[in-house]
């Protein structure tokens, strides 16, 4: 296994490895982790991470918070960036969101998870394995970071939104039951206490049906990669919804032609049918991949709505 850090942009150095003895399913895979930038038409620059075999979480903790018995414990969020199951958009859907959460007094941990596009054993399972392990590690180290272990949520964007939905419904999965290096963290719950899914992909059927409004089915299928197809066929959060899953907040735009709002509507309806507390917002415009959103446009409103929602469920 090779997982180097040839960085085209500066990454934090305080990462927490999720598996000290090698991640299950990747022990024999040799990849060089890649960090690179990608210019966007609007002048912004994406920070991209690829080829992950040794997953980790990057902590972002508000100033003045730490291991102390005389301070009030704060909530925390596991952030899962998107990237079409082939890469991670670290800045817009990771670090920027973490810093915004910190400004609200919420700790954040950005997940650098393995991706199903690489040749891991059981590649469709590795993002879920990493997300479950990340939740357990955060919960196990809650005191160290001054975190309330009963207020740890998950937030994901695009493909990361799928993972947030999946973790919220499949948190008792036995996807790494045979891993021989389990430790005390693995005895802890991987269930998030709340979930946020931003412009998520959820169902491959919804993707195909909605996409046919804009192009032929053949064109839709050409856009969806093999790795996307495999993980979406194996896991459908719509069908995994359960009454004891955490409250969920979902946001999307009506003009998103990448994941399409039908995904968000379907997940919301499945949650409501299971009598799960759910809130859904669909903005008229904003497209796909807006991350924290534009404070001068509709997409920036999701942060305001999220803040009101998280207060309403007693997290802050």
Annotate each PLM feature.
Residues 73-82:
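Short beta-strand element of the alpha/beta-hydrolase
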Residues 3-72:
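N-terminal cap/lid segment of alpha/beta-hydrolase-fold proteins
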Residues 88-97, 111-149, 295-301:
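Catalytic nucleophile-loop/oxyanion-hole region of alpha/beta-hydrolase
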Residues 203-204, 255-259:
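Acidic catalytic loop of the alpha/beta-hydrolase fold
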Residues 244, 249-252, 256:
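Short beta-strand/loop motif that positions the catalytic acidic residue
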